From Swiss-Prot:
One GO molecular-function entry: structural constituent of ribosome
Family: Belongs to the universal ribosomal protein uS3 family.
Ranges for domain KH type-2: 16-85
Function: Binds the lower part of the 30S subunit head.
Pfam families the record matches: KH_2, Ribosomal_S3_C
Cross-referenced SUPFAM superfamilies: Prokaryotic type KH domain (KH-domain type II) (SSF54814), Ribosomal protein S3 C-terminal domain (SSF54821)
Keywords, in A-Z order: Ribonucleoprotein, Ribosomal protein, RNA-binding, rRNA-binding
Gene transcribed to yield this protein: rps3
HAMAP family: Ribosomal_uS3_A
InterPro entries found in the cross-reference section: KH_dom, KH_dom-like_a/b, KH_dom_type_2, KH_sf_prok-type, Ribosomal_S3_C_sf, Ribosomal_uS3_arc, Ribosomal_uS3_C, Ribosomal_uS3_euk/arc
Assembly, per entry: Part of the 30S ribosomal subunit.
GO cellular component: a single term: cytosolic small ribosomal subunit
Name of protein: Small ribosomal subunit protein uS3
Length: 208
C-alpha cells in the first residue's frame, strides 16, 4: 500500500511538473518542490521570472492552483513562487532553455555549446550537457558536451552538483536533455587551497 502511494505521488509530481513547464514558457521555469502540510499541499515553483507565474492580479497562479487540484488530484494545493537569482547556474532553467530551443528547430550542437558558454561565464566550476534521442535521423544517439571540472559519482556528485532532466518534443520523437552544473561557490572535499603567507616586516632601530 505504501509502495503504491509512493508511485502514485511520483507520477503526480511528474505530470504536474510537465504541466507547469508547458504552461509557463516565458517564466523561465526550473522545477518545483512538493511538501505535504497539515492544511494541504505546498508547491514551491522556482522560476526565473516569478511575475509570469503569478500573472496579472494573481490570475495565472489561481488558474494553476485550480488545475492542479482538479485535473491532477492534489489535495488543497498552495502555490509559492521563488525567484532564481542566477538562472544560468540553475540546471533546471538551462535544461529547459535547451529543450525549448530544440523544439523551435535550432541545431542541438549549437544550442549545447551556447548554453555551456553562458554557464561558464557565470563562474561555474564545470558543466555537462547531454542530449539523447533522434537528433538528426531515425537512429537514436547520445551527444555529451562538457567543460571544466565535474564530479560524476559519490557523495560530492549527489550533494554538490545541480542536475536536472527535461524533454523536448520534436517531429522525430522525444529528446532528453540532461544538465549538470558544479556551482562556483562550492569547495570539494579533496580540494586543496594554498594560502599566501603574509611577509613579516621587521623594523630595526639603530641608535647613533
Amino acid at each position: 500500500m505504501i509502495e503504491r502511494t509512493f508511485i502514485k505521488e511520483n507520477v503526480m509530481e511528474t505530470l504536474v511538473d510537465e504541466y507547469l513547464k508547458n504552461k509557463l514558457p516565458r517564466a523561465g521555469y526550473s522545477h518545483m518542490d512538493v511538501k505535504k502540510t497539515p492544511i494541504g499541499t505546498r508547491i514551491t515553483v522556482f522560476a526565473e521570472k516569478p511575475g509570469f507565474v503569478i500573472g496579472r492580479k494573481g490570475k495565472m497562479v489561481k488558474e494553476l492552483t485550480e488545475t492542479i487540484a482538479t485535473k491532477y488530484g492534489v489535495n488543497k494545493p498552495q502555490i509559492e513562487v521563488k525567484q532564481i537569482e542566477s538562472p544560468d547556474l540553475d540546471a533546471g532553467v538551462v535544461a529547459q532553455k535547451i529543450a525549448s530551443s530544440l523544439e523551435r528547430g535550432m541545431h542541438f550542437r549549437r544550442v549545447a555549446h551556447s548554453a555551456i558558454r553562458r554557464v561558464m561565464a557565470q563562474g561555474a566550476k564545470g558543466v555537462v550537457v547531454i542530449v539523447s534521442g533522434k537528433l538528426t535521423g531515425e537512429r537514436s544517439r547520445t551527444e555529451k558536451y562538457m567543460e571544466g571540472y565535474m564530479k560524476h559519482c559519490g557523495e560530492p556528485s549527489e550533494e554538490l552538483v545541480d542536475q536536472c532532466h527535461k524533454i523536448a518534443k520534436l517531429k522525430l520523437g522525444v529528446v532528453g536533455v540532461t544538465v549538470k552544473i558544479m556551482p562556483p561557490e562550492i569547495t570539494l572535499p579533496d580540494e586543496i587551497v594554498i594560502k599566501d603567507v603574509p611577509s613579516k616586516t621587521t623594523v630595526e632601530t639603530v641608535e647613533e
